[in-house]
A protein has these predicted regions:
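Broad phosphate/nucleotide-binding scaffolds in NTP-utilizing and phosphate-metabolizing enzymes
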Residues: 1-207, 212, 220, 224-419
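Histidine-centered phosphotransfer motif of kinases
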Residues: 215
């Protein structure tokens, strides 16, 4: 149940902000498994563990809903941590999902059902949880993240011991760092908090806009500072953005800066699915009110968290469901913004976002082959739904769902048609 709640806390597109905030507090301190169970799992997964480890601490240093972590020392003398999956966690999660679905049928959840299709949400949650419960995927995530940030000297992730990874066991280097929100210890250790905050924000935006592969749960417990580097931990939940997503995000940012409601609405619908008809005039008016309230002439003063939660509510009210990865990014940005408020409140993530877009635009214009790419784009013409006018885009989506009827009236229909 805890893992389900944690995953749901990332879905601002599905649940009201107050629900997500409450669920985000579910940082599980679950009763750990007995070490005998842990030992047996390690033997089943890795074989003769006495040939691998000098010692394994019987006391876990972290116990969560799907796994627990123990310190250990390899035969080589290297200090590591072992992440061990809880016994029968797949079966437990499957049972929990079934119980939730049964509760939906038995209870009168009228308000919530109007907001979201709970059965579909639960299926989606289970798919996400299954990925998190496969530690081979997390090991792949760590390696991909490392490669993406290989040339950035201030970003790193724990080393993975690839020969000691299975679906149920993950062995990584032990990272002894300072929590990213422990201001006093960071200051005592000689860190510049403004510089640290700027590095964190720049890298997170890079993860999204350049790599298209970002940490989807970057709360402070999943980061620490070691030897001048920001260490990202627990990469079980990651988000992905394709080139279309990244371009639409840039378009959205430009629309916000220019206060272009029509373009912003167009982008939001382009990265969404609709579950009913849309009143475009009302939608634009409500988005305009949110912009007027949160975005002044000085965009540095924007309240990111309030702005994103308000937009999410408007979209839910208008039967619009944002792409899952976009909502993961929105949630991640809000979490990073909360961390910045604690350690370097003068840094504004929106300005970092805008500067990154300008940098990318400049690089795109002057990059090798950009003229050829531009020519190809002109020749190819309008080749995606994202380029259609907003009302036409919504109309096409309605037709695809079978929710639109087209009446055709033929003039002079009483006359016989010649073949």
């Amino acid at each position: 149940f805890i893992k389900i709640g944690q995953i749901m806390s990332n879905r601002y597109d599905l649940l009201p902000k107050e629900y997500c905030d409450a669920l985000a507090n579910l940082r599980a301190n679950v009763t750990p498994m007995d070490f005998k169970e842990v030992n047996q799992i390690l033997k089943d997964e890795l074989g003769n563990i006495n040939e691998i480890f000098q010692n394994i601490s019987q006391t876990c240093i972290g116990s969560a809903s799907i796994a627990q972590v123990h310190r250990a020392t390899l035969k080589s003398g290297e200090e590591v941590v072992i992440k061990v999956q809880r016994k029968n966690i797949y079966e437990i999660m499957s049972t929990d999902i079934k119980l939730f679905k049964r509760a939906i049928r038995l209870l009168h959840l009228n308000l919530l059902i109007k907001i979201v299709d709970l059965n579909s949400v639960l299926d989606e949650i289970y798919n996400v949880a299954k990925e998190e419960m496969n530690f081979e995927i997390e090991a792949q995530n760590l390696e991909e993240f490392r490669q993406n940030n290989y040339d950035i000297v201030y970003i790193d992730v724990p080393k993975v011991y690839k020969n000691l990874v299975t679906k149920k066991v993950l062995v990584m280097e032990y990272v002894n760092g300072i929590n990213v929100t422990d201001k006093q210890t960071l200051l005592n250790s000689g860190y510049d908090l403004e510089e640290l905050g700027l590095k964190l924000s720049n890298n997170y935006i890079k993860q999204a806009l350049d790599d298209g592969f970002f940490h989807a749960d970057p709360h402070p417990d999943n980061m620490c500072i070691r030897d001048g580097k920001i260490m990202f931990l627990d990469l079980g939940m990651m988000g992905r953005l394709n080139s279309r997503h990244k371009q639409l995000l840039k378009n959205a940012m430009n629309a916000i800066v220019k206060n272009d409601i029509t373009e912003l609405e167009h982008v939001l619908i382009s990265i969404s699915t609709t579950t009913g008809s849309i009143n475009h005039t009302k939608l634009r008016n409500e988005i305009q009110k949110v912009l007027d309230k949160n975005v002044t002439e000085d965009i540095e003063n924007i309240n990111i968290i309030e702005f994103m939660s308000s937009v999410s509510k408007i979209l839910r009210d208008h039967n619009i469901k944002l792409d899952k990865n976009i909502t993961l990014l929105m949630r991640g940005i809000c979490v990073i913004e909360g961390t910045l408020e604690l350690i370097s409140p003068n840094i504004n993530l929106i300005m970092v976002f805008e500067n990154k877009i300008k940098e990318n635009t400049f690089n795109d214009i002057f990059s090798k082959g950009s003229l050829m790419n531009t020519s190809r784009n002109i020749i190819s013409g309008v080749n995606s739904l994202s380029e259609l006018p907003t009302e036409l885009l919504s109309f096409v989506k309605d037709v695809n769902r079978g929710e639109t009827k087209i009446d055709i009236e033929m003039a002079n229909s009483d006359k016989q048609v010649d073949k």
